[in-house]
Amino acid sequence: MSLTAGIVGLPNVGKSTLFNAITNQKILAENYPFATIEPNVGVVTVPDERMNKLKEMYEPERFIPTAYEFTDIAGLVKGASKGEGLGNKFLSHIREVDAIVEVVRCFDDGKIIHVDGVIDPIRDIETINLELAIADLDVINNRLERVSKKARTTKNKDDMLEVEVLEKCKKSLEENKPIRQLNLTEEEKKIIKSYSFLTQKPIIYLANIKESELGEQDNEHVLKVKEYATKENAKVVSLCAKVEEELSELSEEDKKEMLEGLGIETSGLDKLVMATYDILGLATYFTVGKDEVRAWTFKKGMNAKECAGIIHTDFEKGFIRAEVISYEDLINYGSELKVKEAGKARLEGKDYLMQDGDICHFRFNV
């Protein structure tokens, strides 16, 4: 399942440094056919200790963790929605992503001049969010003009409902509230899905701090960002982009040593990946064997048949059933055979809702 987060930010906030850290990740692109690696795209493996345990247990020929794609969205400046900077190019790129990571400068440094002269993370956030809102309003107004006339003429129920939902979105934006804060029904979400509204996408505010502040209490800038994020149910991740860039160039052993020296357990990039995973409601199931141990990303709420289709469409079309054991049972009993002997293995049908950590063998017939 190919999922992408778009990284946005004003000039001199640390976005380029962060993206350097992402693109320095040593990942085998051929293992991820969905990832057409371009200069503005980086792929990061999703940290998962369970995969290391499975690797030890099976000693597979191939070992493929699940991965996440980050896209560097260039051209976001004040006025981007009206064509400033890269304007329309920026808008077309950001509409394609599943989530937005907004890099916010939360450090003081006289050597790095802020585009507006003074460090103010909330002003920066509001500058970017205003551009996203204006872009959404333009789409809404253009569509409303057409569909309203049609609805008045035809009295078509679907058109009338679309007008109602678009008016609701417009009102929210005019009140400085992103569309994601609206309590839309599943039907309403389906109606506006094709528009890929920017302010409907889940968002993470990435607070870029100094190295000396890692592992310490949040500085005043970060506290302001967290307070702002709470109001719109957004997530905040703090990291030092410069440190992440340095970590990305190290071996796993040296990386671990550097993290210990900094007094932190997890890299900021790993925290970012997991936060992105969380806001999109993602989970992982595994396929295991001597030939390959692999992690697969799915959206919570997907059933066994749909999850089989993530591997290959033939698996979904010819789905018969899924042999399922939980990761915890496999670790506790030590082998698939012992799990089966204990009566803990299950045969599940197409409607079974997959759980994070399920280990599956799919039976299918095409």
Model-derived features with residue positions:
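Conserved G1/Walker A P-loop phosphate-binding module
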Residues: 1-111, 147
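C-terminal-of-GTPase-core extension/linker across diverse P-loop GTPases
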Residues: 2-8, 13, 19, 146-353, ...
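Short capping/connector residues at structural and topological boundaries
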Residues: 6, 34, 39-42, 49-51, ...
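Glycine-rich, flexible loop/turn motifs
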Residues: 25-33, 40-42, 50-53, 82, ...
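Amphipathic alpha-helical transducer elements in NTP-driven molecular machines
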Residues: 34, 48-51, 64-70, 84-97, ...
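Conserved Switch II/interswitch segment of TRAFAC-class P-loop GTPases
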Residues: 42-47, 74-81, 95-159, 172-185, ...
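A ubiquitous short alpha-helical element
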Residues: 58, 128-132, 241
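Short, flexible surface segments
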Residues: 96, 355-356
